[in-house]
Amino acid sequence: AQAKKHKKAKIYIDKQSKIFSSKRFIKKDELLRLISSKNVDTVIAAISGSDGLELIHHSIISGKKVLIANKEPLVMAGEFIVREAKKYGAQIIPIDSEHCSIHQSIQGKRENSISKIILTCSGGPFFNLPKSKFKNISLKQALKHPIWKMGQKITIDSSTLMNKALEIIEARYLFNIEPKKIDAIIHPEG
């Protein structure tokens, strides 16, 4: 939606999409040149997995404001990303989920003034299931999230609460806070 709104936006997608006309797409080498340009001040990093790490690092060493839309880069390389951002004067800003809300709520506060971060999770499809029945859980049951419609991997991560563990790692690096000061609580309404 943002790319359509901003007519001159350049789009790099690691897999070709039918959403936009092909003349709006650019190749990776062109993207790296564009990121380095003085005309670019902000880069949205929304490539899943490790594929986006090179682009994030290039944005950081170019001193850009990097809007991160997923947790994977910080889970894989959080310490490196934060260290490089400080070194090159880049900003790392989360634009996804609870981390975006936390970021917005702590603006203007001293970094060490955060005493605790509490992340919520729905508890997934097995919240009320007795532990004795866990051994009989099927893939179909695990893929039926009570609140969200998501892809298979994120649904399984959510069902097993692994997603929340990854978000704790993400928060640790984004907000420079020790893991013992980050809690996750179940809130069934999601």
Residue ranges with predicted function:
Residues 14-15, 69-71, 96:
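Short beta->alpha connector loops at strand-helix junctions that form conserved
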Residues 156-190:
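Substrate-binding/catalytic subdomain of NAD(P)-dependent oxidoreductase enzymes
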Residues 1-50, 55:
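N-terminal glycine-/serine-/threonine-rich beta1-alpha1-beta2 phosphate-ribose binding loop
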Residues 80-94, 106-117:
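Basic phosphate/pyrophosphate-binding loop/patch that engages nucleotide-derived ligands
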